A protein has these predicted regions:
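Mature-chain termini and adjacent capping regions
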Residues: 1-126
Length: 126
């Protein structure tokens, strides 16, 4: 991955944490695809390599876009969690949810909603 920010500051309370503003992250996968993530704020743990993105999070992957208010990539626990007003737009359809939880090692996705367990989805079936 490559992690960039317009501004970055060491956390005075913990030197392992770097607070960032206007963050861009690029995750490169073995199949030559790239996930790009942008947020207004972020925190990087230079010991565990974990990343937190917050405020107007936007992501793009192979023509799909995602927006939310929070995203957490845990390198140490092998998961990616997207939360708070999650919206996904794709050529195959779109949906909104409260939280997405990707278990990277199991390659599973859990979609959660606080609206009586329901998500709003429109799927294009051909």
């Amino acid at each position: 991955y490559i992690l960039k920010a317009k501004e970055a500051f060491n956390d005075p309370n913990d030197p392992n944490f770097i607070k960032m503003k206007n963050v861009n992250a690029f995750f490169y996968f073995k199949d030559d695809t790239v996930l790009e993530v942008f947020s207004e704020k972020g925190i990087y743990n230079n010991k565990t390599l974990d990343m937190n993105f917050s405020k107007n999070v936007k992501a793009a992957y192979e023509g799909s876009t995602l927006t939310s208010q929070k995203a957490e990539y845990s390198n140490s626990n092998n998961f990616l969690q997207i939360s708070e007003n999650v919206k996904v737009d794709d050529i195959r359809g779109n949906f909104t949810a409260e939280k997405l939880y990707f278990d990277i090692s199991k390659q599973t996705l859990n979609i959660a909603s606080s609206k009586k367990g329901k998500i709003n989805a429109n799927i294009n079936i051909k």
